[in-house]
Swiss-Prot record:
It is found in: Secreted. Expressed by the venom gland. SUPFAM superfamilies: Phospholipase A2, PLA2. PANTHER family: PHOSPHOLIPASE A2 (PTHR11716:SF100), PHOSPHOLIPASE A2 FAMILY MEMBER (PTHR11716). GO terms for cellular component: extracellular region. Transmembrane segments: none annotated. One of its GO terms (molecular function) is calcium-dependent phospholipase A2 activity. The lineage of its organism: Eukaryota, Metazoa, Chordata, Craniata, Vertebrata. Keywords: Disulfide bond, Secreted. Signal peptide: none annotated. GO terms for biological process: arachidonate secretion; lipid catabolic process; phospholipid metabolic process. Residues 106-118 are annotated as: Important for membrane-damaging activities in eukaryotes and bacteria. This is Basic phospholipase A2 homolog 1. Disulfide bonds join 11-71, 27-117, 29-45, 44-98, 51-91, 60-84, 78-89.
Amino acid sequence: NLIQFSQLIQCANKGKRPTLHYMDYGCYCGPGGSGTPVDDLDRCCKTNDDCYGQAEKKGCSPLSTNYNFDCFPGGPQCGKGTTCQRFVCDCDLKAALCFAKSPYNNKNFNIDTKKRCK
């Protein structure tokens, strides 16, 4: 679920950037998504959106699925669970690790998506 995704992000980036900074970034970070991603970080969000789409095709509900994960010094790791729990955790884990390695560009926060995301 979104709370766990937020915690995964914080674990992966070691608390360097608040999760809220990722909730309205580029064309894909946040609700919806369209057009061409504006940068690598936005591509992470598009990949996560696509992964959620695959989860839904498997009958999972990615926004409300609770899953288990651990935050180790080397980064987060998904725990055991049902097929849906594992799949959604893997989606979020990949995104969180992608966020942690992608540069954050302040000019892509809270952009005019109607103009820039065609």
